[in-house]
């Protein structure tokens, strides 16, 4: 029974950690995000009352020390902003929008394959919008020069494009700009069928003097996302920059202090959301300085940018540069494909696989394999769980073999307790000697529990972060595996015309999970200690309410895992000659307790 008690204490400790972790990592950030969103909205309303919208974009001050930071955004509707300057239409299988010829900005982009809700008639996702709108978000590539070089392409430079130009996956567009010093900039923009833009620039010097230039690239965003952030997921600045490797910086950290990694060669940088991202891959052979910055003038503005070392274009010569711009959904095979085909270092880390990367990503690959076969990610979760249980079967077998041996040792353990009733140290020494003689490892039963913790959190990451799970249906009422079960027992699962308090929302799948957890715990004898027994009885109920707000896919996994565990434990216990006490324990719940003898 000591082994069982030890396992109970471990389970209790883990349960407490999970509950506290859930509160700290999930609920607290949601509450804080809602509070900040309300404060930001109030501050914005106050700002709009005293600040008149700027009339058009103004060229920011440009220095040789950093990329342009943009300007405080005006507040205009999308339609008004799109009419302020000429544009080139973007139309591909995955994207729609336009390129702003003022600055050659990519600032109008929608993702055709994704809707805001599970309803296909809902609006498609807007990734980029012009700086003049409330939540402006764009990428821009330009140059920094000196008075001697004349005007060079920057935020307000008006490029020219052929009449009727249209960017598709098959037809690139070519933009051009010539200044009064004889510098001609020719920019060819192409895009593939998904989300990667290639921007190839050619600079020709037809003037009389050498031209010293630096190129820059930036991803600029006005205001933070309004979706609640959680600590298990990184949203904000991201990049793989030279020897510094992967850098993930929260918005809040940059608000306190700008981040400027060491000068580097190679890599990429940008801004990432849960499902979407915008990144720039600079020319990989040139040294550059990267910056993650925050600007508080006007609307809050966040910027990831780079500026490369100065280079010189001699008279009569030309130079060519190429940048890559990723703007779209973080689809796993697409991201992996870009990493391989463009040799972008660690580009797959754009998806937040977490600390258990070596488990999380292979688990997604396995799940994706089953999805391709069955066409349903819910079924893929069930199949993946079976594979994981099969892999852990030898460990589980050892665990229950250890439990069987411990149960066989109970009579001897009781004798030792009676013999050393007043000698705690002597009991411990005698117990350890008994373990040694019988070749029993008292902690053998703990390893399967400990080893499955990374598996659980890795699966949670897969379900929570991968866009493939977004709006992925199961069967029946589950239309989105990445969202909580929408049903609730409060209104009898939709039969009554009200919702009830959110705290009491308890869907069908959390109920199923609670029942399976209850049955699994009844496979073992109830602890003799009253406190342990009380926790033993209440744990399924606590977990039901705790998991009610978790993604439905995770709850389905847990319920299915419990079911498989019951079957697995019963099989192993029979193989080792241990009585399965499930039905006896269930019957014991309904037996009337005998009155104590007087």
From Swiss-Prot:
GO terms for cellular component: plasma membrane. It comes from the Bacteria. It is a multi-pass membrane protein. It is found in: Cell inner membrane. Residues 40-76 have a biased composition (Low complexity). Required for the insertion and/or proper folding and/or complex formation of integral membrane proteins into the membrane. Involved in integration of membrane proteins that insert both dependently and independently of the Sec translocase complex, as well as at least some lipoproteins. Aids folding of multispanning membrane proteins. Belongs to the OXA1/ALB3/YidC family. Type 1 subfamily. This is Membrane protein insertase YidC. It comes from Rhizobium johnstonii (strain DSM 114642 / LMG 32736 / 3841) (Rhizobium leguminosarum bv. viciae). The lineage of its organism: Bacteria, Pseudomonadati, Pseudomonadota, Alphaproteobacteria, Hyphomicrobiales.
């Amino acid at each position: 029974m000591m082994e069982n008690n030890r396992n109970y204490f471990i389970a209790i400790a883990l349960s407490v950690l999970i509950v506290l972790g859930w509160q700290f990592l999930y609920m607290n950030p949601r509450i804080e995000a809602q509070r900040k969103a309300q404060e930001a909205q109030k501050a914005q309303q106050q700002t709009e009352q005293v600040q008149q919208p700027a009339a058009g974009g103004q060229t920011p001050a440009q220095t040789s020390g950093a990329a342009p930071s943009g300007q405080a955004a005006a507040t205009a509707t999308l339609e008004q902003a799109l009419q302020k300057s000429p544009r080139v239409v973007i139309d591909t299988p995955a994207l729609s929008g336009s390129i702003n010829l003022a600055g050659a900005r990519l600032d109008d982009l929608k993702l055709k394959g994704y809707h805001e809700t599970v309803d296909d008639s809902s609006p498609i996702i807007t990734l980029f919008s012009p700086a003049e709108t409330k939540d402006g978000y764009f990428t821009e590539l330009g140059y920094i020069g000196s008075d001697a070089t004349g005007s060079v392409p920057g935020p307000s430079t008006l490029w020219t494009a052929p009449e009727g130009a249209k960017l598709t996956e098959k037809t690139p567009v070519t933009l051009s700009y010539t200044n009064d010093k004889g510098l001609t900039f020719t920019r060819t923009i192409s895009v593939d069928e998904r989300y990667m833009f290639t921007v190839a620039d050619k600079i020709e010097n037809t003037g009389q003097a050498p031209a010293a230039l630096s190129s820059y690239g930036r991803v600029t965003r006005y205001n933070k996302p309004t979706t609640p952030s959680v600590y298990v997921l990184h949203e904000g600045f991201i990049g793989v920059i030279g020897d510094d490797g992967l850098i993930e910086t929260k918005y809040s950290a940059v608000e306190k202090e700008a981040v400027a990694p060491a000068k580097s060669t190679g890599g990429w940088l940008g801004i990432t959301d849960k499902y979407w991202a915008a990144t720039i891959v600079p020319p990989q052979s040139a040294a550059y300085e990267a910056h993650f910055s925050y600007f508080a003038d006007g609307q809050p503005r966040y910027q990831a940018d780079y500026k490369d070392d100065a280079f010189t274009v001699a008279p009569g010569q030309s130079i060519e540069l190429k940048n890559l711009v990723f703007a779209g959904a973080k689809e796993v095979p697409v991201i992996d494909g870009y990493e391989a085909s463009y040799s972008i270092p660690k580009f797959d880390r754009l998806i937040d696989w977490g600390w258990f990367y070596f488990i999380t990503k292979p688990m997604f690959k396995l799940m994706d394999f089953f999805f391709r076969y069955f066409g349903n990610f819910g079924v893929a979760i069930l199949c993946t769980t079976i594979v994981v249980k099969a892999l852990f079967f030898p460990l589980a077998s050892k665990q229950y073999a250890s439990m069987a041996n411990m149960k066989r040792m109970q009579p001897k353990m009781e004798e030792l307790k009676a013999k050393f009733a007043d000698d705690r140290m002597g009991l411990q020494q005698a117990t350890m000697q008994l373990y040694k003689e019988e070749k029993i490892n008292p902690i053998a039963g703990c390893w399967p529990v400990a080893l499955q913790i990374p598996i659980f959190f890795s699966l949670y990451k897969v379900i929570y972060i991968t866009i493939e799970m977004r709006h992925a249906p199961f069967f029946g009422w589950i239309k989105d595996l990445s969202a909580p079960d929408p049903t609730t027992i409060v209104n009898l699962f939709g039969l009554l015309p009200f919702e009830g308090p959110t705290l009491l929302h308890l869907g069908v799948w959390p109920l199923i999970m609670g029942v399976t957890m209850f049955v699994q715990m009844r496979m073992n004898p109830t602890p003799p200690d009253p406190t342990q027994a009380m926790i033993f009885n209440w744990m399924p109920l606590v977990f039901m309410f705790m998991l009610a707000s978790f993604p439905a896919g995770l709850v389905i996994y847990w319920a299915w895992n419990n079911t498989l565990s019951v079957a697995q434990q019963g099989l192993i216990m029979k193989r080792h000659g241990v009585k399965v006490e499930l039905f006896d324990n269930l019957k014991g719940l309904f037996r009337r307790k005998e009155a104590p003898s007087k």
